[in-house]
Design a protein with these regions (language model features):
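BRCT (BRCA1 C-terminal) domain core and associated BRCT-interaction motifs
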Residues: 4, 8-25, 35-39, 107, ...
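Short, charged N-terminal helix-start/capping segments
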Residues: 17-25, 74-85, 206-213
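Extracellularly exposed regions in secreted/surface proteins, prominently low-complexity, repeat-rich
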Residues: 47, 178, 182-232
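Terminal domain-initiation and capping elements
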Residues: 2-55, 221, 227-230
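Intrinsically disordered, low-complexity regions
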Residues: 4, 8-11, 71-72, 77-80, ...
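Intrinsically disordered, low-complexity segments enriched in small/polar residues
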Residues: 6, 63, 70, 74, ...
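Generic detector of well-ordered alpha-helical segments enriched in charged/polar residues
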Residues: 72, 150-154, 190-193, 197
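Extracytoplasmic low-complexity, Pro/Thr/Ser/Ala/Gly-rich segments
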Residues: 44-113, 121-123, 127, 228, ...
Length: 232
């Protein structure tokens, strides 16, 4: 008896693969992808809104013959992402009161000095916001030569808005808004600052006392991103 006869002349039927589970999986993955990207865009939009500062109002009584200072150009939050941060000891900052809270500028300045940055000038009132009506966390203002210093300061004050003005030196201003809290760098920011300090100490100091920065500081890009990944 042949094998076909033994099986009763029955040919095994081809079992079709059901595409439904695969389709369901593709749909689920698509929904998850849309959810993740929506969350990313929403988070970016939220933090942009949270760090945005209102424009200054004109002073009620301006000194005769004296033009109000220019507010500068507001930059995007990621505008300094490709800029190497400066060593903290080479950052010179002036803290300004733009919210009307007494003594806050002096207290914040002391916190910054404790973090390793230096004083550019004594804390004072903000000439750009003479009515003390800055309703945001604050602004970091700098010129073309102070981008590295501003990058370092943005690690300490990640919720401050970046503003580029026409100053020619490397000093940086930190103007405090009504939503400003205090200086609280996260773990990643502390690591970056420590690495910058360590790298700066290893750089040669030529005659004249001014250290020459050779090369780029070996700072991990993911640490820089994490240092500013905060809730504002």
């Amino acid at each position: 008896m042949s094998a076909a006869s033994a099986l009763g002349n029955k040919i095994p039927r081809y079992r079709r693969r059901r595409p439904l589970p695969a389709v369901i999986m593709l749909v689920v993955l698509g929904v998850l992808s849309v959810f993740v990207w929506t969350k990313v865009f929403r988070s970016t939009s939220d933090i942009d809104a949270a760090t945005n500062c209102n424009p200054p109002t004109p002073p009620s009584t301006a000194p005769e013959g004296q033009a109000p200072p220019k507010a500068g150009q507001v930059l995007g939050r990621d505008s300094l992402d490709r800029t190497d941060p400066a060593v903290p000891s080479r950052v010179q900052v002036r803290v300004l009161n733009a919210n009307g809270q007494r003594n806050q500028a002096s207290l914040v300045a002391e916190e910054l000095y404790a973090a390793g940055v230096n004083k550019a000038a004594e804390p004072g009132n903000d000439p750009v916001y003479p009515n003390f009506d800055m309703h945001c966390h604050g602004q970091i203002r700098f010129g073309p030569n102070g981008a590295g210093a501003a990058r370092t300061l943005s690690l300490l004050v990640p919720c401050a808005q970046l503003v580029r003005d026409e100053r020619q030196d490397a000093t940086v201003d930190l103007a405090l808004g009504s939503k400003f809290g205090d200086i609280k760098p996260n773990h990643a920011a502390k690591r970056v600052l420590a690495d910058l300090r360590s790298w700066g100490e290893r750089q040669p100091t030529p005659e004249g006392g001014q250290a020459a920065e050779a090369g780029r500081p070996p700072i991990e890009a993911n640490l820089l991103a994490e240092a500013r990944d905060v809730h504002c």
